[in-house]
């Protein structure tokens, strides 16, 4: 199966404007995310952006960047727009949406997000154990999953605020995998 990683990036973040170019130990955040995606060795890596500064940074470091409409409503819309531009041969089986603010993501986890697609799910994501500090933090997305001793299972619901105690809550990791049909369907909801 042919996979591609697309990293959506925008400078006009509501919570932290200019975030993609903010340096972490001297290297812009978006460049660090792009490097982690390259390290995963899963397939081609693209940064989907609407600002020329981000585009030029990635290209000047040997990467591939796709310019997208600055008015797109979400990162997934940006990923979809870039996917349509690069899938000329209709040969991409898996699209990985890696958030542009995940500079510390383990490259192995990027590779792991395709496992649900290989098992006939149409959308995949990752979850990890939730610690006590994260449970009531609205900035941490929680996902309800009943793994039943399986490593891969269906997500039942996503939460920011938790109003009931649920033992099946996990910390949702903001990376997704899609089949071409599922991302097309998702965008058109």
Region locations from a protein language model:
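Residue-level signal for inorganic ion chemistry
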Residues: 30, 101, 179
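Short beta-strand segments
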Residues: 8, 97-99, 126-127
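Short, high-confidence coil segments that cap the C-terminus of an alpha-helix
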Residues: 42, 90-92, 119-122
């Amino acid at each position: 199966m042919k996979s591609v990683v697309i990293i959506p990036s925008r400078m006009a973040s509501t919570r932290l404007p200019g975030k993609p170019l903010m340096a972490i130990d001297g290297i812009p955040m978006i460049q660090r995310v792009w490097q982690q995606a390259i390290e995963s060795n899963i397939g081609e890596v693209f940064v989907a952006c609407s600002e020329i500064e981000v585009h030029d940074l990635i290209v000047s470091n040997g990467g591939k960047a796709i310019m997208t409409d600055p008015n797109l409503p979400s990162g997934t819309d940006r990923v979809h727009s870039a996917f349509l531009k690069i899938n000329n041969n209709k040969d991409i089986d898996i699209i990985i949406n890696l958030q542009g603010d995940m500079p510390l993501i383990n490259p192995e986890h990027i590779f792991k997000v395709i496992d649900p697609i290989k098992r006939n799910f149409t959308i995949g994501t990752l979850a990890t154990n939730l610690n006590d500090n994260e449970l009531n933090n609205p900035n941490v997305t929680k996902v309800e999953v009943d793994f039943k001793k399986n490593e891969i299972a269906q997500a039942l619901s996503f939460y920011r605020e938790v109003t009931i105690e649920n033992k099946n809550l996990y910390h949702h990791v903001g990376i997704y995998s899609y089949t071409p049909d599922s991302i097309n369907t998702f965008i058109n909801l």
